[in-house]
Amino acid sequence: GNVTMPWGSTPKGWVKFMEERPYFSGSFMWTGFDYHGETNPFYHSNVSSSFGTIDICGMEKPPFYYYKSWWTDGVVLKLTPHWNFRKGDKVTVAVFTNCEEITLLLNGKKIETRKIEKYDQALFTLDFEPGVLEVVGTKNGNTYTDKLETSGKTSSVTVTEIEPITKSGDIAIYE
C-alpha cells in the first residue's frame, strides 16, 4: 500500500522517514521541479509553484543539496544562498553537507567549527562584511571547500535581440 508523508513535510522529516523504512525500494517526492500553476500560498502575479528542489530554469535550490547529501556517497558541501548584502546586515547562511566537520571563514578569519550529525544542516547567523565567505569541510581525512564572494559593481549590461517581434502579440527574444 501507499505510505505517505504529510503535506508540507520538511526535507529532514522526509529523509528520516525514508531512513527508518529500509524495506522501501524507493520514493516519490512531489515536487522535484517547480512548475507552472498552483502558486499557493502566493497568488497575485505569480505563475509557478515554488515547492520543487529544482527551479523552473533547472537550477538546484538549497533543499536539493540536503537531499543529495543524504543519498550520495560522493562529497556534498554547499554554502547558500549568496554573499551580496549591506554592510552590517544580519545574514543567515546554510551549509548542506555530508562532511563530518565544517569550518566557516569570513575573509580568512575563522567564525566557527562544527561537527555535522546525520540529517543536519548547519545554519550560521553573522554580520555581513563584503569579501569571501568560505566553508571548509572534512570527510574521510580529505578537505573540501565551497565559497561565496561579494560581487563588484556592474559596469555594463549588454542585451542583444536574437529574435525580433514580427507581429502584434509576438515575443522578442534577447540574450
Identify the function of each model-found stretch.
Residues G1-K115, Q121-F128, V132-N142:
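Extended substrate-binding grooves/exosites of carbohydrate-active enzymes
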Residues K115-E117, V157-T158:
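A short, polar/proline- and glycine-enriched secondary-structure boundary/capping micro-motif
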